[in-house]
Amino acid sequence: MRNRISSFAPLAFAFTITHAAPPSAAPTRFEVSFAAAAHATPLTGRLILILSKTAQAEPRMLVSPQGPAVFGVDLDQLRPAQPAVVDNSAIGYPTSLADLPAGDYYAQAVIDVYTQVHRVDGHTIWVHMNDGRIETFQIAEGNLYSDVQRVHVGTGGTIKLSLTHVMPAQPREEDTEWVKHVSIQSQKLTQFWGRPIYVHATLLLPKGYAEHPNTYYPSVYTLGHGTPFQFSTTPGRNSGTISPITGTESGYDFYQQWITDSMPRLIAVSLEQQTPYFPDSYSVNSANNGPYGDAIVDEVMPALEQQFRIIRKPYARVLEGASTSGWQTLAMMLQHPDFFGGAYVLQPDPIDFRHYQQTNIYADSNAFSIPFGQFMSAERPFRRTTQGQVVWTMRQLSRFEAVLGSHGRSSYQLEAWEAVYGPVGPDGYPRPLWDKLTGKIDHEVAAYMRDHGFDLRDYAQRNWSTLGPKLVGKLHFFAGDMDDFYLNLAVYDFQEMLKSSQNPHYEAEFTFGRPMKGHSWHNWTWAGFARVAGAYVKANTPPGEATDWNY
């Protein structure tokens, strides 16, 4: 899933076409072009046409599985002023243009601009490249977009849109007394992609950091994307409250605790590591994304430990993450058990691919439907409410992603997993785990994912004789019993595997939020976790190691 902090995080209700109005009686086609003033040369990319029923916001800012209707077309060296056609042949979500109810809409078009890259593996591909900072196509620097235009669909004819605007660079946050920003070019990733690739870090410094120039501090890698613990020195509308959904406090309330004398002195670090396929690399080596795992452990973390006074020993490195970051946390702990001292894994993306949410990718033949009896089948859900109401299905999300990009370039969730876990296809792009329109599972891809260690339960079980002794005391799992994305199921699987572990027998710590705790549930406030992490490091500090950070 997307990390806990996201400008375009999914909302709670699915978009459903209601046929109060009949489908378009006459075919409507759109001709979309871009102005030479916006882009002077031919471009390759993905044209996304958005039709919204509301004028409350720009349609491009509403794109999501429960948002407006969207339609996608690939562009191959489209010239300025040359029209690209969006008609009934274009793939659409949640329906085709022909089946869209007739009526008035607010139309806007965006071009996600691609760059040709020559990877070290010999493949030449077209993908959206940036500097490694988190962004989505709606706001990505250099992408083109049109003005919003009110249109009528259903009476035929041609509607023309012109993309005249170029998205500017997003503002960068400035360093403060407490928060520092560092950009590190990875030589390993630069070699893989054939162009400079950066990983960006945001560090939260402890109270007294400047006044103790000879003190080195434990590190907590909170593997989200924003400032660690949502730290903010500015009061907000949620100040003074605890979120009933997450159980966490506001960033300002955390700041008020961070500066107290009772708070452990830690350096908290978050990372930005956007790839062409998703806003996060998952911090592992990948055939499609490149050696992000090696880059982070061998290049990024040592550079941070040198620039900031961070203890350079395993006992003082703690990992914490939720959702995407939860999977990262466990994967990094399993792959580098001698480098990290502990892992707090919250509602991770699937860590047992027998529960790839509700799909067993090894045994099931189709990701979209579950057969029952001789004639019946049910749709596989992707998301639910904490009361069990299904709001998205696998079929819906797969189609949505197919609209946003071909060849795995949607930068959305299902295709993110394929890019991280899966093999490179013959065309140089990620080979799909299943067909996006039929749901048929490719079991060769599933086997590749397992055999290359991305099914973390399978990886841990197969390597337990050497891995287990290095993990004892280090694993802490947390999940809501009604996780929105069914991620608790794979956590249960991992727990069962550990219950049967031998030599060593280690059951780890598992805490489940009950009753009806969803995907964003946390077992503690941010300040509460900082205290837990500090106490954990203190308890596991070897004799003779410096403890002057605990002032």
Feature-to-residue mapping (PLM):
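Non-catalytic cap/lid and distal C-terminal segments of serine-dependent acyl enzymes
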Residues: 37, 52-551
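Positively charged n-region of N-terminal signal peptides that target proteins for export
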Residues: 1-4
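Bacterial N-terminal signal peptides
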Residues: 7-18
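Contiguous beta-strand segments within globular domains
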Residues: 26-34, 41-48, 198-202
